């Protein structure tokens, strides 16, 4: 998608629908000229101006507050005009058409934020944090996104990049001046700096992993034979009657999905049709969808009945589970055998004894899910991150570890310098210092219009 930096762009910046206030945002070289036509004059910079918004014939379209921010002291780094009027869809569309008539064009999704990025008002991680802040599903997620927007994540990445640059300079100097009597590569300084960078990378990666969990959450699929209590567990976790619960086997015939939170971590829980040899066509489709959902899961909860031995059909379900997706075995209905809630681990396999109907042992399950996803209930130092950030950090970590091995085993300065360059490039992709146009297009077009 072509985002021109020479155009003047405009969009309705408030959410669709009716509201007390609606905002039309304008950014670009013609913003001041548009203000003169719509307001009769260009407002004093950064002062609220109250007055009528005028149409082409001088008629009043609306009245409200106008704000003008001259470049470069604006969100986009360009001249920015905001017209804050009444929040009716007809009025806002009327006002937007007037602005377009005066030379602006309709903004693409995320174009205001992209202009801010192109004009160095924020980096790519901060721009993404704007969308994450808007989409935050919990207070923890909002606070983490705000930290990223304020530059916490970017500052740590930039610090790592600077350390890599300084180390590259030192290593390449040692390569370029081999006649020096001192072997700079073996004097311990390079090894010490490499270790320091590795430790810092691990810390940033751990915080980023928490940020990804806050943003994207965990997908959990509940499986089992009919009447194992899958729907009861979904209802217990969600705190409401999301799924129909009866004693009739096969009540759930399609996937029921609930979005819940555990201490701020989003959890996408899917209740599936009971797995069995079904003859009903509708139930067969539900079972097929259940198997499809399994492949997309982060974790699978296989439910069996605590008041009976593992059924051959239960064993068959367990044996069919994909090896790359972790499974937790849930023994439900402990109230029928008067057993206390329990979590046990055997050879890396987790089993939880609970009663979904009576909400016994739910705390064990919730803590287990948080632990398995590596989620820590702390906000200190956690910033919002995306999977692409994790991939970049993991790539940088790989190259620094490889460079460390080149130094320790081969004293290969040239190979170390190249690994450091690759690590630097991977980190620079996070903030946009080294980023393809295709990536920029994908990121900014995912934003809402008006941002």
Curated annotation (Swiss-Prot):
Under InterPro entries, the record lists: G_TrmE, GTP-bd, GTP-bd_TrmE_N, GTPase_MnmE, MnmE_dom2, MnmE_helical, P-loop_NTPase, Small_GTP-bd
Q: Which UniProt keywords apply?
A: Cytoplasm, GTP-binding, Hydrolase, Magnesium, Metal-binding, Nucleotide-binding, Potassium, tRNA processing
Q: Does the keyword Chaperone apply?
A: no
Q: Molecular function terms in GO for this entry?
A: GTP binding; GTPase activity; metal ion binding
Residues that, per the record, bind Mg(2+): 231, 252
Q: What class of enzyme is it?
A: hydrolase
Example GO biological process term? tRNA wobble uridine modification
For the ligand (GTP), the binding residues are 227-232, 246-252, 271-274
Annotated residues that bind K(+) are located at: 227, 246, 248, 251
- Where it mainly occurs, coarsely classed, is cytoplasm
Work out whether the entry's keyword set contains Ribonucleoprotein: no
Q: What does this protein do?
A: Exhibits a very high intrinsic GTPase hydrolysis rate. Involved in the addition of a carboxymethylaminomethyl (cmnm) group at the wobble position (U34) of certain tRNAs, forming tRNA-cmnm(5)s(2)U34.
NCBIfam families given in the database record: mnmE_trmE_thdF, PRK05291.1-3, small_GTP
The name this protein goes by in its record = tRNA modification GTPase MnmE
| Naturally occurring in which organism (per UniProt) | Hydrogenovibrio crunogenus (strain DSM 25203 / XCL-2)
